[in-house]
Amino acid sequence: MALNLRKNHPLLKIINDSLIDLPTPSNISAWWNFGSLLGICLITQIVTGLLLAMHYTADTSLAFASVAHVCRNVQFGWLIRNLHANGASFFFICIYLHIGRGFYYGSYLNKETWNIGVLLLLALMATAFVGYVLPWGQMSFWGATVITNLFSAIPYIGQTLVEWLWGGFSVDNPTLTRFFAFHFLLPFVIAGLTLVHLTFLHETGSNNPLGIPSDCDKIPFHPYYSIKDLLGFALMLIPFISLALFSPNLLGDPENFTPANPLATPPHIKPEWYFLFAYAILRSIPNKLGGVLALAASVLVLFLIPLLHVSKQRSMTFRPLSQILFWTLVADLLILTWVGSQPVEHPFIIIGQLASFAYFTIILILFPIVSALENKMLKL
């Protein structure tokens, strides 16, 4: 009998084992669709980004004009740019929902997969930040100035580090050039990390909504989940393309339509919406180093989540107290996002401080306490 090429060819075998014959739990819900959606986001961003890079000039005197040129003179340049700009927003929507799913269902107990995932989030945040600087508008320039300046809070080496990062004494041409280099490189680092993420995931197999072993009831990925993923793609691409075509500037800052001017500071410097929660935490501490540490901790706390798991159950499906805490945390993050977009004045300052305090308290203190309480109530 002839060998099945799909199962025996050195390259096709890898694809087969991860996308076709992969044994998958039979009960994973739509919350498990976001991994493949993130893959689609990454591919979209790399393709549109490559097309934009062909027309972009990484020079302070030409960057803004080159972006305008793409939108005016390049065939479908406006569409490519709008897809790339809004693709970043959808990338973050998907990754936040994906992390939320992992948190709710206890997927973080696959520690290697989770830790690589957190590294992926950090790489994505770095990519988005350096990318936002490239159009060289007002918010690009001042955003870069404010965020890179945070490194100067590091004791002893801070100032030297910032000047080394800038390539001078302020954000200028060398900064823009290196940021373009980083923005081009990092997505490929993300693609590499994604393969590592999947490699670790396929060592253990997917978790499921019940948080129990599912080896006794696995089904092949194709056709069941391949068709489900296609539905997910359609449901994401429809709002994504609608946003890019009907209101492409909805999520952007109008300040970025003004070319960068080091002599005029915008009245309200704020990052894109997906960084606002962290920005609110940064601003809520009236001390530079303290704010920087809180900012770093707001994302790095994700590394601690597997260590803080004290429940005897993996998933939150049958833990109503933890569920209440989880949705309180979600609401808290939405409050932080809103506060981050507001000016630094009363009552936003105190709201931001309370929300920041609540964020760390819920994750580091309340979740372990409530989990232990649930164990006791269930006599586990």
Swiss-Prot record:
Membrane topology: Multi-pass membrane protein
GO CC aspect terms: mitochondrial inner membrane; respiratory chain complex III
List of residues binding heme b b562: H84, H183
Cysteine pairs bridged by disulfides in the record: none
GO BP terms in the entry: mitochondrial electron transport, ubiquinol to cytochrome c
PROSITE patterns the record matches: CYTB_CTER, CYTB_NTER
Subcellular location: Mitochondrion inner membrane
The keyword Manganese belongs to this UniProt entry's keyword annotation: no
Keywords: Electron transport, Heme, Iron, Membrane, Metal-binding, Mitochondrion, Mitochondrion inner membrane, Respiratory chain, Transmembrane, Transmembrane helix, Transport, Ubiquinone
Chain sites annotated for binding a ubiquinone: H202
TM region positions: 34-54, 78-99, 114-134, 179-199, 227-247, 289-309, 321-341, 348-368
Cofactor binding note from Swiss-Prot or TrEMBL: Binds 2 heme b groups non-covalently.
Record's miscellaneous remark: Heme 1 (or BL or b562) is low-potential and absorbs at about 562 nm, and heme 2 (or BH or b566) is high-potential and absorbs at about 566 nm.
Stated name of the protein: Cytochrome b
Organism listed in the record: Cyanocitta stelleri (Steller's jay)
Lineage: Eukaryota, Metazoa, Chordata, Craniata, Vertebrata
